[in-house]
Curated annotation (Swiss-Prot):
Highest taxon in the source lineage: Eukaryota
Keyword Repeat: yes
Residue stretches making up the F-box domain: 7-60
Pfam families: F-box, LRR_At5g56370
LRR repeats: 118-146, 171-196, 218-243, 249-274, 299-330, 331-356
Keywords: Leucine-rich repeat, Repeat
Protein name stated in the entry: F-box/LRR-repeat protein At4g14103
Keyword Transferase recorded: no
Coiled-coil residues: none
Species of the source: Arabidopsis thaliana (Mouse-ear cress)
Cited SMART domains: FBOX
PANTHER family: RNI-LIKE SUPERFAMILY PROTEIN
């Protein structure tokens, strides 16, 4: 084939199409096109998405060189783009990056009107986000994933367009007060994810957001329990909740809830007593105020842990008049004492799914299975 007459088809494309193509490339490759010609340098300046990850860019043997090279690379990328508008900025860095360099990067993208901001800062030195993050009028989507030391310390919060907030492994300087301040400054918030947030050390935890539609909270440890948890979310339709039973639930407003995934757990010392057969007739903790407020759901997923809670930490199982789909997780260490009452109180149930049938044998499974003699576990029902 004669290629002598071939031409650069991509370079001849209209600028808006070429820029759109660049937006699908990893930032490192997109930035490298700026050396091809003045045109490509101009086009890179208008790439709307930047994804910067120090683990995938440069890999010299010396760790210091990695950090320095990456920091210099970010400086060059932001300089190339100047003040052009930015849609999404994602920054993932580990320890070794100078925190002093990070703040100007964040301020740069905020000043350019970024709408999606994803910060994964796994630092081992003290670091506070610049206050401008909490006063950005253009943010619609904000994800904060921190390591050991970065914390959220807020005074004034005004995020008028923010609809999605994701916070993972993050410490609040003022504990529950800090979370309350943050949420109160998000008048349009619809999606909230709180993952690995140790609110058991707080005096109280409050999620009060009238506009919220979806909430996910996850805390996996069960050595401690939260003192007080308040959920005032009247328009919430989806809830995924993993936590140890709290000391109290002063207010739980879930009137619009349609789908719930619940993994409530007993405190570990109480769980040990339960497994050893102590106090099986005594209630441990009290999840009644929480459980009673999810009775409007149509779709419900219950973990094996939650079956324990229904048995030993709930005054009564509410009537689930709207429930049509129920999924129950099984575990060989957990009995089904609460299952008969749960099924009896679900008069409109259409679909029942058991994720595993192995469970701890007890005398109180009622007519839900064939557990007649208590053995270590029942293989099937």
């Amino acid at each position: 084939m004669d290629l002598s007459g071939s031409r650069d088809v991509i370079s001849s494309l209209p600028d808006d199409i070429s820029s759109h193509i660049l937006s699908f490339l990893p930032t490192k490759e997109a930035a490298s096109t700026s050396v091809l010609s003045k045109k490509w340098r101009y086009l890179f300046a208008f790439v709307p998405n930047l994804d910067l990850d120090d683990s995938v860019y440069l890999n010299p043997e010396n760790e210091t060189e990695i950090s320095t090279s990456f920091m210099d690379f970010v400086d060059r990328v932001l300089a190339l783009q100047g003040n052009s508008p930015l849609h999404k900025f994602s920054l993932k860095i580990g320890d070794g990056i100078d925190p002093v360099r990070i703040i100007p990067w964040i301020n740069n993208v905020l000043e350019r009107g970024v709408s999606d901001l994803d910060l994964h800062l796994n630092l081992e030195s003290e670091f506070l986000l610049p206050s401008q993050v909490y006063l950005c009028k253009t943010l619609v989507w904000l994800k904060l994933r921190f390591g050991l030391y970065p914390t959220i310390d807020v005074e004034d919060v005004h995020l008028p367009k923010l609809k999605t907030l994701y916070i993972e492994a993050t410490h609040f300087e003022e504990h529950g007060v800090g979370l309350t301040k943050l949420l109160s400054g998000c008048p349009m918030l619809e999606d909230l994810v709180l993952d690995d947030i140790s609110w058991f050390i707080w005096d109280f935890a409050s999620v009060s957001v009238p506009t919220l539609k979806r909430l996910r909270f996850s805390w996996q440890e069960r050595d401690e329990f939260p003192k007080s948890v308040l959920l005032d979310t009247p328009n919430l339709v989806y809830l995924k909740f993993t936590d140890t039973v709290a000391g109290k639930y002063p207010k739980v407003n879930l009137d619009s809830l349609v789908e719930a995934h619940i993994d409530l757990r007993l405190l570990k010392p109480l769980l040990i007593n339960y497994h050893q057969g102590y106090g099986e007739n005594d209630m441990v903790g009290n999840a009644t105020d929480f459980i009673m407020r999810i009775c409007n759901v149509k779709t419900l997923y219950l973990s094996a842990n939650t079956l324990q809670v229904l048995t030993y930490s709930c005054d009564a199982i509410p009537i689930f008049n709207n429930l049509t789909h129920l999924t129950i997780e099984s575990n060989p260490r957990v009995g089904w004492q609460s299952v008969p009452g749960l099924l009896k109180n679900s008069p409109n149930l259409e679909t029942l799914i058991f994720q595993g049938l192995i469970h701890k044998a007890t005398y109180r499974c009622g007519d839900v299975c064939l557990c007649k003699k208590p053995r270590k576990e029942i293989l099937s029902c």
